[in-house]
Design a protein with these regions (language model features):
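Blade/loop signatures of beta-propeller domains
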Residues: 38-58, 63-99, 276
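C-terminal motif of bacterial Sec signal peptides marking the signal peptidase cleavage site
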Residues: 22-25
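Bacterial signal peptide processing site
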Residues: 27-30
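Extracytoplasmic beta-rich repeat domains
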Residues: 100-119, 147-166, 193-208, 231-253, ...
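Structural signature of WD-repeat beta-propellers
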Residues: 129-130, 160, 169, 176, ...
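Short loop/turn segments that connect beta-strands within beta-propeller blades
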Residues: 138-142, 185-188, 225-229, 271-274, ...
C-alpha cells in the first residue's frame, strides 16, 4: 500500500557596488576578450535603469571574497545540476564563443511555455519543448537522436504548460502538464513505464537513490520507483489556489529529500518512507503588496554540506540545518530563482532585478549589483525577468527575458560583459563538460565553448 503523509494544518506563517551607466565597452566575444571573433547577430543593449534596495553590510567592505577553484562537471543530469543543487564553481573556458546552435523542437507561445532547463548526460542533451515533445540531441554528431510526442490522445496541445526532464540509470524521466510521469530509454526514446499522477506537473522531476521525486500542481510530492514506476509514498502539503507558473524541484541529500511548495512550506522528508523530519515556512509578512500576498515558492531549495538554503518570491530567505530543522539565519530577500552556493558565499537574483552576494555562514550581504528592470525605463514598461545565476569560469552568468546574457564578477559584483541573444532567455544557463548551454524562448539551444 502506498504511504501518504500530510502536512500539519498549522498556518504557514574590497567592497564594490557595480554602478554602470552604459556598457559601451562590452567585448565582441561572449563575456570578454578577442576582438576578431564575431558575436551573435543582434544589437548591443545598454543598462539604462539601475535601482538598489538591498544594502551591503559596511563591516564586510574589506573582506575579500574567496571561492573554490573551478571544477569540471561531465554531466548536468537533473534540474539544478545535481540532486542537491549545489555545484559551487564550474569550469568553462576564459573566452566563450558560440560553438553551435540547434533548433530543439517548438518554441514558446502565449499559451505554452518552457519552464525547465535541458539536462545533459551520456553524451546527449535532453529537453521537453513547449508542445510536450521530449527530444534527445547527440552531442557527438549534432543530430537529433530521437523525439517523442507525449501529449495524450484527445488532449489540447495548448495545455502544454510546464513539465521537464531528468536523467538517471540509463533512463530519461519526463514530467508533463497532463499529469504523466514517463520513463524513456535514453538510447532509443522507447517507453519503459508511464504513470499518471492525476494533477499537472509544472516542474521537472529529480532522480536519486533509485527514486524519482516530483511535485504536482496541487502540492503533492510523489516518490516513485525509478526502475518500475511503482508509487512508493506521497506527501500532501497544504493546497494553495494562487501561485506562479513554475514550481520548485526537490533537492536530495543522503536519506532526506527537501521540497518547497506553493503554500510557502519547505519540508524535509525521509527518502525511504516519506516521514516528515522537519518543516519551515517561507512566507514573509513584513510588507503589504501583491507580491507578498502570494506564498508561492518557485525557487528550488539547495542542500550544501548539511545546510538547506531556500527562498520565496514573497521575500523570505532561510538557512536551515538539514538534520535538526533549526533555522540558523534568515533574510528579507525575494526571488523565484534557485540560490547558487559557492564555498562560503551564496548568490541570488532577486525579483527586483538585483544580484546579491551573501555570506553562507550568517546571511550578511557582501555586495549588491542592480540590473535593468524595464525595457522602457522612462515609462516603466516591458518588465525584464532575470534568471540564474550560474557560477562558471570566475563569472556569474545571468540571462534576461528580453534577450540578454550578462557576466558579473562573483568577487565584486562588477558587470564584466553583456551580449544580446536573438531571442529571449527565461531560463538560467546549464554547464556540462566545459560547455555552457542557453535555451532561448524559441527553443534554440546555443552551445558556448
Amino acid at each position: 500500500m502506498t504511504a501518504v503523509t500530510r502536512a500539519p494544518r498549522w498556518v504557514v506563517a574590497g567592497m564594490a557596488i557595480a554602478a554602470v551607466g552604459g556598457l559601451g565597452g562590452c567585448a565582441d566575444t561572449w563575456f570578454g576578450g578577442g576582438e576578431d571573433e564575431a558575436p551573435l547577430p543582434g544589437q548591443r543593449l545598454s543598462v539604462l535603469l539601475l535601482e538598489r534596495s538591498l544594502e551591503p553590510d559596511p563591516l564586510l567592505a574589506s573582506e575579500p571574497v574567496v571561492l573554490p577553484r573551478p571544477l569540471a562537471n561531465e554531466d548536468w543530469p537533473v534540474a539544478g545540476g545535481n540532486p542537491g543543487h549545489a555545484l559551487h564553481h564550474l569550469a568553462v573556458g576564459d573566452l566563450l564563443d558560440v560553438a553551435w546552435r540547434r533548433d530543439m523542437g517548438e518554441g514558446e507561445t502565449d499559451d505554452n511555455l518552457i519552464l525547465s532547463t535541458p539536462v545533459v548526460a551520456g553524451g546527449k542533451v535532453f529537453l521537453l519543448d513547449s508542445e510536450t515533445n521530449a527530444i534527445a540531441l547527440d552531442l557527438a554528431s549534432g543530430a537529433v537522436a530521437w523525439e517523442r510526442a507525449l501529449i495524450p490522445e484527445f488532449e489540447d496541445e495548448d495545455a502544454s504548460l510546464g513539465g521537464g526532464v531528468a536523467y538517471g540509470e540509463g533512463l530519461v524521466f519526463v514530467s508533463t502538464a497532463f499529469g504523466d510521469l514517463i520513463a524513456l530509454d535514453a538510447a532509443s526514446g522507447g517507453t519503459v513505464w508511464q504513470k499518471n499522477l492525476s494533477a499537472p506537473l509544472r516542474a521537472a522531476p529529480t532522480v536519486a537513490n533509485g527514486r524519482v521525486f516530483v511535485i504536482t500542481y496541487d502540492n503533492r510530492l510523489f516518490a516513485v520507483d525509478a526502475a518500475g514506476g511503482e508509487i512508493l509514498w506521497i506527501h500532501e502539503a497544504i493546497i494553495e489556489s494562487a501561485g506562479l507558473l513554475g514550481a520548485a524541484v526537490p533537492a536530495v541529500s543522503g536519506d532526506l529529500v527537501v521540497a518547497s511548495f506553493s503554500s510557502g512550506e519547505v519540508v524535509a522528508l525521509r527518502v525511504e518512507n516519506g516521514r516528515q523530519a522537519w518543516a519551515d515556512s517561507l512566507i514573509f509578512q513584513g510588507r503589504m503588496g501583491a507580491r507578498t500576498n502570494l506564498s508561492d515558492v518557485d525557487a528550488s531549495p539547495v542542500i550544501d554540506r548539511g545546510l538547506v538554503i531556500a527562498i520565496s518570491q514573497s521575500g523570505r530567505l532561510v538557512a536551515v540545518d538539514l538534520r535538526s530543522g533549526l533555522r540558523l539565519w534568515d533574510q528579507e530577500i525575494p526571488s523565484t530563482q534557485m540560490p547558487w552556493v559557492a564555498g562560503d558565499y551564496i548568490y541570488i537574483v532577486t525579483v527586483d532585478a538585483e544580484v546579491v552576494c551573501l555570506r553562507r555562514g550568517d546571511g550578511r550581504i557582501r555586495w549588491v549589483t542592480s540590473l535593468p528592470r524595464f525595457e522602457d525605463p522612462e515609462e516603466r514598461e516591458g518588465l525584464i525577468l532575470w534568471s540564474g545565476p550560474v557560477l562558471a569560469g570566475d563569472r556569474l552568468v545571468v540571462t534576461a527575458s528580453d534577450g540578454v546574457a550578462m557576466a558579473i564578477s562573483p568577487y565584486t559584483g562588477e558587470i564584466l560583459g553583456l551580449q544580446d541573444v536573438p531571442d529571449g532567455v527565461r531560463l538560467p544557463p546549464i554547464v556540462a563538460n566545459g560547455t555552457m548551454y542557453l535555451l532561448t524562448t524559441n527553443a534554440e539551444l546555443i552551445a558556448l565553448k
